[in-house]
Amino acid sequence: MKVLVLFSVLFLTLFSYSSTEAIDELDSDAEEDMLSLMANEQVRAKACTPRLHDCSHDRHSCCRGELFKDVCYCFYPEGEDKTEVCSCQQPKSHKYIEKVVDKAKTVVG
């Protein structure tokens, strides 16, 4: 009976050791996969369109201001040409809110 208990304890110890090594290998593989996916995602990220530049090619590509993302506004300029012109602009409400936040930061500290 003592021999059976001794072998069962030895078996359980070896089994737990082998399972932890297998889990560690899976974790390291998962970390490597995640790092490669993050590297690919950074390569895919496209540059944003700065304020007052043309955004007609991609209307959702405007850069962020301090607090808010700029908005792509489209309009038709006066004159002979009837083509639509789009540019990234900061809405006035966002501009005023950013000014209030800046003033509050200087007052508070």
Curated annotation (Swiss-Prot):
Residues 89-108 are annotated as: Linear cationic cytotoxin domain. It is found in: Secreted. Residues 1-22 form the signal peptide. Residues 45-88 are annotated as: Knottin domain. The keyword Repeat does not apply. Residues 23-44 form a propeptide. One of its GO terms (molecular function) is toxin activity. Its main location: secreted. Disulfide bonds join C48-C63, C55-C72, C62-C88, C74-C86. InterPro entries: Spider_toxin_CSTX_knottin, Spider_toxin_CSTX_Knottin_CS. Keywords: Calcium channel impairing toxin, Disulfide bond, Ion channel impairing toxin, Knottin, Secreted, Signal, Toxin. The keyword Signal applies. GO terms for cellular component: extracellular region. Expressed by the venom gland. Belongs to the neurotoxin 19 (CSTX) family. 05 (U4-Lctx) subfamily. Enhances the high-affinity desensitization of human P2RX3 purinoceptors. The toxin is composed of 2 domains: a highly rigid N-terminal inhibitor cystine knot (knottin) domain and a rather flexible C-terminal linear cationic cytotoxin domain that forms amphiphilic alpha-helices. This is U4-lycotoxin-Ls1a.
